[in-house]
A protein has these predicted regions:
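AAA+/SF3 P-loop NTPase mechanochemical coupling elements
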Residues: 17-20, 54-64, 76, 82, ...
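NAD(P)-dependent short-chain dehydrogenase/reductase
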Residues: 41, 146-159
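C-terminal helical "lid" of AAA+/P-loop NTPase domains
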Residues: 172-175, 184-196
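Short conserved motifs of the RecA-like P-loop NTPase core
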Residues: 161-179
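Conserved AAA+/SF3 P-loop NTPase catalytic/coupling segment centered on the Walker-B
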Residues: 3-4, 29-41, 52-88, 117-127, ...
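Short gly/ser/thr-rich secondary-structure transition/capping motifs
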Residues: 47-52, 89-94
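Walker A/P-loop
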Residues: 1-24
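Conserved AAA+ ATPase "SRH/arginine-finger" region at the nucleotide-binding site
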Residues: 25-27, 130-145
Length: 196
C-alpha cells in the first residue's frame, strides 16, 4: 500500500521521476539496534570497527523520495528519538561526524503490527500527521482475503509472464492459513507457490 502511494505521488508530481522508494524492515535489526541507526543516518569511515568506507545512510539515499520503515515498533527508543529530532527540521548528524549537520528532504512512512500507542515514543507518535489502521488478514472477510489472493496471483502471473492456475485445495490453503506476517507473508507464500 505504501509503495503504491509513492508511485501515485510520482505519477502526480508530488515526487520527481528520480525519487527513490527505500523500504527498511526494522525487525531485521531487532538484535542490533546500533546497526539500524548507523544505516539510517549514515556513518563516516572509522566511526566504528568495520566502518571501512563512508555510508551516506538511507535517509540521504531516499532524499527527495520516501523512506518506509516497516515494523517500526522494533526500533529502540534511542533511534526513535533521533527520528523525532530529524522529523522536526530534516537535519541530522552522521555517526562519526558530530561537527557537521546534514539535511534530507524525505517523506517518512511507518508501519507496525503492534499498537503504536504502546510501542512508539509519544514524541514520535505526535509527529506522525496521518495515521491509518489497515486491518490484519485475520480480521478481514473471506471475500476480502479472496480478492487479495486473486490480485497477488494476477500480479505474479504478469511478473513471470505465465498464466497461473491453482486448484481448490491450494486455494483453500491460501485462504485459511493463519498469516502472522500478514499480507507480506501471504504475498511471499503466493510467490513461492507460483515458483514450484
Amino acid at each position: 500500500i505504501i509503495e503504491k502511494m509513492f508511485e501515485y505521488g510520482k505519477n502526480n508530481g508530488i515526487f520527481s521521476e528520480k525519487a527513490k522508494f527505500v523500504h527498511v524492515n526494522c525487525s531485521e535489526y531487532a538484535n542490533n539496534p546500533e546497526l539500524i541507526t548507523a544505516n539510517l543516518f549514515g556513518y563516516k569511515r572509522g566511526a566504528f570497527t568495520g566502518a571501512d568506507n563512508d555510508n551516506p545512510g538511507l535517509i540521504k539515499v531516499a532524499d527527495g523520495g520516501m523512506l518506509f520503515l516497516d515494523e517500526v515498533h522494533c526500533l529502540k527508543p534511542e533511534c526513535q528519538e533521533k527520528l523525532f529530532l530529524f522529523m522536526d527540521k530534516g537535519n541530522y548528524h552522521v555517526l562519526g561526524d558530530s561537527e557537521n549537520e546534514y539535511h534530507s528532504n524525505v517523506f517518512l512512512a511507518f508501519a507496525t503490527t503492534e499498537n503504536p500507542k504502546e510501542v512508539l515514543l509519544k514524541t514520535l507518535l505526535r509527529r506522525i500527521p496521518i495515521q491509518m489502521e489497515i486491518p490484519s488478514l485475520s480480521k478481514r472477510s473471506e471475500m476480502e482475503k479472496s480478492n487479495i489472493i486473486v490480485r497477488f496471483l494476477e500480479n505474479e502471473a504478469k511478473h513471470i509472464h505465465k498464466e497461473i492456475r491453482i486448484g481448490n485445495v491450494v486455494y483453500a490453503a491460501l485462504l485459511n492459513n493463519e498469516y502472522e506476517g500478514n499480507i507480506g507473508e501471504l504475498k511471499n507464500v503466493i510467490q513461492e507457490t507460483c515458483m514450484n
